[in-house]
Amino acid sequence: PLCLNTVQGYWVNLLRVRKSGVLSRHRHPAPVHGVVLRGSWHYLEHDWKATEGSYVFEPPGETHTLVVPENVPEMITMFHITGAMIYVDPYGRQTGYEDVFTKIEMCRAHYTKTGLGGDYVDQFIC
C-alpha cells in the first residue's frame, strides 16, 4: 500500500501483476481512480484497453472483471479505492469484500510472515 486512510475509508496501492489472466470480478460502492504505470489490461465488460499512462475511472456500482492479456509480462497500476471492493460471482452475488480495515489486517499478516513485523503497516495508515 501507499496509503491506508481509516478516517475517510480509502486506500491507495500499486497493483502489480506478472501473470496474464483474469484477476477478479468485483464492484465498488464509491468511485475508483487509477493510473496505468506499466503494461496494459482491460475489463471483459468494456471494449477499451487501459495502457501505460492511461487514467482509469470506475463508476460506483458497476461490476467489472479485470483481465491482463497474455502478451503483457508485467502490469502495474496505481489505484485509489474509496469504500470497498465487493467480489461477486458470475451472477452478481457477493463472495467477499475488502475495505481499508481488511487491507490493514492483510498487510499486518503479510509483514509478520515476511519478518518485517506487523507494526510495519502503521507507517502507511493515515
What function would you assign to each model-found segment?
Residues 26-28, 64:
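Histidine-centered active-site/metal-ligand motif
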